[in-house]
Design a protein with these regions (language model features):
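FMN-binding flavodoxin-like domain, especially the glycine-rich phosphate-binding loop
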Residues: 2-3, 9, 13-16, 20-161
Length: 161
């Protein structure tokens, strides 16, 4: 199985979160995973994945304009219809709108025909309703949350298999 994590990152915080998720995916089993900044996506690789996870810093309680534009321009080229999808976000402030950013990406994926997943509260704590959120000032403190999310997403991908 193959997965891609595609993100925008201004200060490398969202990039670090993507790396944590990749750790979790690898813990789940035999999953090849690669992370891409939206400036350097390998379209050949991504068109062959079974799952795509998107991440964005939160800006004005939403995804960055750069991420929104990238999704609108590029997502059709990726052939993600029917593929598993998920989303995550980082933010600078508590209640900075990261859940709105995650919802925006999830809705976009659903409109494009992807099957979205998070695990919700079915696995117990940590409960990850829509997708993980980490504070940029201390992203390392959220490492385990992102790793857990990656592992849960990976297990779902392998079940879907």
């Amino acid at each position: 199985m193959k997965a891609a994590i595609i993100y925008d990152s201004r200060t490398n915080t969202t990039e670090k979160a993507a790396g944590f998720i990749a750790e979790g995916l690898k813990k789940a089993g035999e999953i090849e995973v690669r992370c891409f900044n939206i400036d350097n996506v390998d379209f050949d690789y991504v068109t062959g994945v079974d799952m795509a996870i998107f991440g964005s810093p939160t800006y004005m309680a939403s995804v960055t304009g750069k991420m929104k534009n990238w999704l609108e321009v590029n997502v059709r080229k990726l052939g993600l219809v029917g593929k598993l999808g998920g989303a995550f976000a980082t933010e600078q402030y508590i209640h900075g709108g990261a859940e709105n950013a995650i919802k925006e990406m999830l809705v976009f994926m659903m409109v494009m025909g992807m099957m979205v997943y998070s695990g919700g509260n079915s696995y117990g704590k940590p409960v990850i309703h829509l997708g993980p959120v980490g504070m940029s000032q201390n992203i390392e403190d959220f490492r385990e949350l992102f790793v857990t999310y990656g592992e849960r997403m990976g297990k779902q991908l392998l079940r879907k298999g």
